[in-house]
């Protein structure tokens, strides 16, 4: 795999079959992007989809958002690392112990897999948080969980671009920010409530940009990826 890749773009293989995902991968250059495998794709096709993408020289972000008791979370993260995953995530709300143990399990087994946490899903807003019993607002919850993630020595968090500036100031420049909800100006917002353009997200402090439909549903995905990279 191309460990020297310098692109911030992670293409999300969401709502796609294995055949469609591999057909898309065959149109893209692994030197220009990484690929994200989420719950649906992984549940349907398992490790084989990851292996097939690795065979095409892509680095893979396994977006399974593990959320369980500490040992189960740590073992799941370790299993992902053993697949050769570039990056994997957990829910910060699983707690400090789960995150810390997962990171330590990677270190104990000499894996350099990036481990990041999800604070608040980008589909959620203040009203959605109130429905779950969190009443002090989106910003407070994101900041609280990001700080907990840093304390657990994880590599970064998933966050919206609107949260990036504050989180860089709060957690430091080395704390990686992975931003979904990236759209071009003429794209539909779909189910993301906190969205941003690629260039603005980087300006705001995001390190990696998760881009799905803008590329996967394009007539020419490779050309669309090039257009996005040129816009940066």
Swiss-Prot record:
One of its GO terms (biological process) is 'de novo' UMP biosynthetic process. GO terms for molecular function: orotidine-5'-phosphate decarboxylase activity. Pfam families: OMPdecase. Its EC number is 4.1.1.23. Substrate binds at residues 14, 36, 63-72, 122, 183, 192, 212-213. Catalyzes the decarboxylation of orotidine 5'-monophosphate (OMP) to uridine 5'-monophosphate (UMP). Homodimer. Belongs to the OMP decarboxylase family. Type 1 subfamily. This is Orotidine 5'-phosphate decarboxylase.
């Amino acid at each position: 795999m191309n460990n020297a890749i310098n692109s911030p773009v992670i293409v999300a293989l969401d709502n796609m079959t294995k055949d469609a995902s591999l057909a898309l991968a065959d149109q893209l250059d692994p030197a220009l992007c990484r690929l994200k495998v989420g719950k649906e794709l992984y549940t349907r096709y398992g490790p084989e989809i990851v292996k097939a993408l690795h065979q095409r020289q892509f680095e893979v972000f396994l977006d399974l958002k593990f959320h369980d008791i500490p040992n189960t979370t740590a073992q799941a993260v370790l299993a992902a690392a053993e697949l050769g995953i570039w990056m994997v995530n957990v829910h910060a709300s699983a707690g400090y112990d789960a995150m810390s143990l997962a990171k330590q399990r990677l270190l104990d087994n000499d894996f350099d897999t990036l481990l990041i946490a999800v604070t608040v899903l980008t589909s959620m807003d203040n009203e959605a948080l109130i429905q779950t019993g969190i009443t002090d607002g989106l910003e407070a919850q994101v900041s609280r969980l990001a700080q907990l993630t840093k304390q657990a020595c994880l590599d970064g968090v998933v966050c919206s671009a609107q949260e990036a500036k504050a989180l860089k100031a709060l957690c430091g420049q080395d704390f990686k920010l992975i931003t979904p909800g990236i759209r071009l100006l003429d794209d539909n917002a779909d189910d993301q409530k906190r969205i941003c353009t690629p260039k603005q997200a980087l300006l705001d402090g995001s390190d990696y940009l998760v881009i799905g439909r803008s590329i996967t549903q394009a007539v020419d995905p490779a050309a669309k990826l090039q257009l996005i990279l040129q816009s940066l």
